[in-house]
Amino acid sequence: MSGWMPSPGNALAPAGLRLLRSLAAGSAVVLSVVLPTAVAAADEPAGATVVGRLVQAWAESFPGKAGHADDGQLSWVEPAEGDPVLVDSAGVEGVPSGSTVAVTLGTDGPDGSGDGALPVLDTQVLGHSSSELPAPAPSTNQVTVAMVAPAGSDPAGDGTTLEQVVSAVEDRVAPFWAEQSDGAITLGVTEIHDWTAAAVTCEQPGQLWDDIAARVRFEPGPGKHLLLYVSRGAGCGYALAEVGTAPSSGGRIYVTDTSTSAIAHEFGHNFGLGHSSAEQCDGAVEGGFCRTVAYRDYYDVMGVSWSQTGNLNAAQAALLGLLPEAQQQLLSVKGSAITATLTPLSGRVGTRALRLTDADGIVYWLEYRTATARDGWLASSANRFGLESGVLLRRAGGLPDTSVLLDGTPTAAAGWDGDYRATLPVGVAVTVSGGDFSVVVQGLTPAGAVVSVAPNSPAGGGAPAAPAPRIPHGGVVLPGSGEAAAETLAPTVEEAPEVGAPQFSGAVQRVGPDLEPASEATRGSGALVVGAGALLVGSTLLVARRLWTGALRHH
């Protein structure tokens, strides 16, 4: 996958070595760890120089599994020959993923943990991934589908047929992305390969992809995707996808399900998207006592997977360049007050989004969701969570949450778990970004939402609300600096009353996510949540825990 590099919008935040230790040892505490075992086992002497491709990752927890390490960045160097070498992310900070580097290593494990994460004494960038790859043919993304039984599983597979997977891509996923991109993204299955027994397990996903790619003669490149369907009984994660930089990046995926939302979500990662998550604050839209929950945007395909495959929201569409300038109106904190009419996002005409940029350059998006076209389920019995039509407010961000849904009708922390209402109230001024903007929804009709926005330019720069601590599926909250506090297991969320509604489930039983108790949630922005798994950026991987109609789906 050399030749691909992350865009500035996909930059990763720094992270501590506690994360690296957890991923190296995580196989003892989770059902499966997707980080290649060779990374954790790398053994290089102090002072050695390793030359290879830099790979960067973001760790996330398996659902319902508490007691791992913080979310954060992983980095390793892949030499041309031999095992990858896990290194301290701080030593390669600012180096784009995919670059060719020469890294001089320090002594083993700065805290003596023996985790294999090595300090970096010096880093030299020998070459960057080319950002000038030739684009594929217009509106063409070629998909190679292969059915795979990882080592140790039944070589005959799990009963899923090649035809089912091909149909999922061509009949459901391809039309979805063609619709979302107004025809700019066209997925087509160009090669198919029936069940084959792999020589490696899912614990080494890179090697699994490489093994199958060699067998089917798949050549990576722009607009080329390798989609593996792997046996459900092989102990693999629910799904895994490389994170690209654009819809033309191509990339590799494996899935254990043929659901539309699951496969469409994974292609979204290949195209360059992170997750659509949600932030909840105690009685406020932003600021104060808050939490951010991974995947909790049920409106959006990049949120949790369930029976509805939601429209790509404005923040995610803009990230891919799929929201035309003519369909968005821009306003900065230094601008003048405006009143605009937002047309339904699903209608794909008119002004579909307002983009607000605060004093620090943070971008917020307003969009109008109605029960029309792809969002028609909002007015049907399929709307299991009672999601509302109305104006939604999101904050754009970097990986892993490239979109964060804000709660326009916030409740007290005690009611967070059962609160799925997020639309802005009509006739009520809502403060955005610590007062940089005041937003009022003046009225709603099926044809549009009238929205007034008044900027408040601060004299000495903005003071936006700090991002809330991010809470993935499962985990405990730890301090963001200093030594880890005593771990506190969190309660589960009550299951929605409708049978089959997706939940943030545990690894072996249908339960809610292990969220931090509202009474114990961390104030401010200095908390991290434990995690294991991997989100790899650029020419790397993304692991997402997803659920389908109430049954466990983990990856």
Show which residues each predicted segment covers.
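Propeptide-to-catalytic entry region of secreted or membrane-anchored zinc metalloproteases
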Residues: 83-84, 90-102, 106-262, 271-283, ...
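Structural detector for short beta-strands of small beta-barrel domains
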Residues: 43-75
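Short, aromatic-rich amphipathic segments at membrane interfaces
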Residues: 507-525
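Secretory targeting and sorting signals
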Residues: 2-42, 527-548
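Extracellular hydrolytic enzyme modules, especially secreted metalloproteases
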Residues: 220, 225, 232-377
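Short, solvent-exposed loop/turn elements at domain surfaces
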Residues: 62-63, 151-160, 309-314, 373-377
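Non-catalytic C-terminal accessory/binding modules of secreted extracellular proteins
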Residues: 90-93, 250-251, 346-513, 532, ...
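Short consensus segments that form the blades of beta-propeller domains
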Residues: 64-68, 134-136, 291-292, 378-385
